[in-house]
Amino acid sequence: MAVPKKRTSTSKKRIRKNIWKRKGYSIALKAFSLAKSLSTGNSKSFFVRQTKINK
């Protein structure tokens, strides 16, 4: 089983953590943008069927 020889430095840990956070932030931003466009009806990539409720 592979075992790391030396301890990972604090700066390297911080860099990796920030990259991971940045990826999550950009994905969340895209998801929010898509949800916003779907709710306003400006989406060009999704076709949402509108159902009318008759009372």
UniProtKB/Swiss-Prot annotation:
Pfam families: Ribosomal_L32p. Transmembrane segments: none annotated. InterPro entries: Ribosomal_bL32 (IPR002677), Ribosomal_bL32_plant/cyanobact (IPR044958), Ribosomal_zn-bd (IPR011332). It is found in: Plastid, Chloroplast. One of its GO terms (molecular function) is structural constituent of ribosome. Keywords: Chloroplast, Plastid, Ribonucleoprotein, Ribosomal protein. One of its GO terms (cellular component) is large ribosomal subunit. One of its GO terms (biological process) is translation. HAMAP family: Ribosomal_bL32 (MF_00340). Belongs to the bacterial ribosomal protein bL32 family. This is Large ribosomal subunit protein bL32c. It comes from Nicotiana tabacum.
